[in-house]
Amino acid sequence: MNQHNSLDSSDITYKTEELLEATTNRYKITVQVANRAKRRKYEDVDIIDDPQVKPVIRAILEMVDEITQPEIISD
């Protein structure tokens, strides 16, 4: 999660576009991002990692990593 601390808005925009380009259904991925962000918000209510990184941005970054680096999940 430390890598997410140094992102600026252009990096976030790039990652969002990368996520949208990697999927065939933009609506479905948007709903998945929203659901993950909502779930993370309520699961991590006691844990304050970084108030600068909003749950939706964290969800986008995690999902891009999962899609572009499948070896993360397979381990």
Swiss-Prot record:
It catalyses: RNA(n) + a ribonucleoside 5'-triphosphate = RNA(n+1) + diphosphate. InterPro entries: DNA-dir_RNA_pol_omega, Pol_omega/Rpo6/RPB6, RPB6/omega-like_sf. The keyword DNA repair does not apply. Its EC number is 2.7.7.6. Keywords: Chloroplast, DNA-directed RNA polymerase, Nucleotidyltransferase, Plastid, Transcription, Transferase. It is found in: Plastid, Chloroplast. The keyword Nucleus does not apply. Transmembrane segments: none annotated. GO terms for molecular function: DNA binding; DNA-directed RNA polymerase activity. One of its GO terms (biological process) is DNA-templated transcription. One of its GO terms (cellular component) is chloroplast. Pfam families: RNA_pol_Rpb6 (PF01192). It comes from the Eukaryota. HAMAP family: RNApol_bact_RpoZ. Belongs to the RNA polymerase subunit omega family. May be involved in RNA polymerase activity. This is Putative DNA-directed RNA polymerase subunit omega. The gene is rpoZ.
